[in-house]
Design a protein with these regions (language model features):
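Conserved binding/recognition cores within well-folded domains
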Residues: 1-104, 108-110
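Short, charged, intrinsically disordered terminal tails
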Residues: 122-130
Length: 130
């Protein structure tokens, strides 16, 4: 008999709902699963085995994820890893000054040496007319 292919269950640090074409991501935090709108994520910050999601409304969600898993799960046209500890939503960048990406007037993330070339390529490609 034909049966649908079985999916392996998600491993620790993975999420069940991370297809790149989705609008929301499911996140386990504080003993519950929450749906977070992907466009509301300003940046992600690695804290050891945890990832802190900084959201547009100023709140944060800390979840047991690896930043590497989030990097592959989020849409690459909207998110870029810019440091070993940070992934930013490219649509939320307000300024780029001396190796720092400003997300608002006071909050910024550093750009790691290994990520500068790729980020500069993104800037050159998308903002060359400025």
């Amino acid at each position: 008999p034909d049966r649908p292919p079985t999916r392996r269950p998600p491993q620790e640090g993975e999420s069940e709902a991370l297809p790149k074409d989705k609008e929301y991501i499911s996140v386990k935090a504080d003993y519950k699963v929450s749906l977070v709108k992907i466009s509301d994520i300003v940046y992600l910050e690695s804290e050891g085995e945890y990832v802190r999601m900084h959201l547009a409304d100023g709140t944060t969600i800390t979840t047991l994820f690896r930043l590497k898993n989030m990097e592959t799960a989020l849409p690459s046209e909207s998110f870029m890893r810019v440091h070993r500890s940070y992934i930013v939503n490219l649509r939320t960048i307000k300024a780029y000054v001396k190796g720092r990406i400003f997300l608002n007037d006071t909050e910024y993330v550093p750009i790691g040496e290994n990520y500068k070339e790729a980020f500069q390529g993104y800037i050159d490609k998308n903002f060359r007319n400025l």
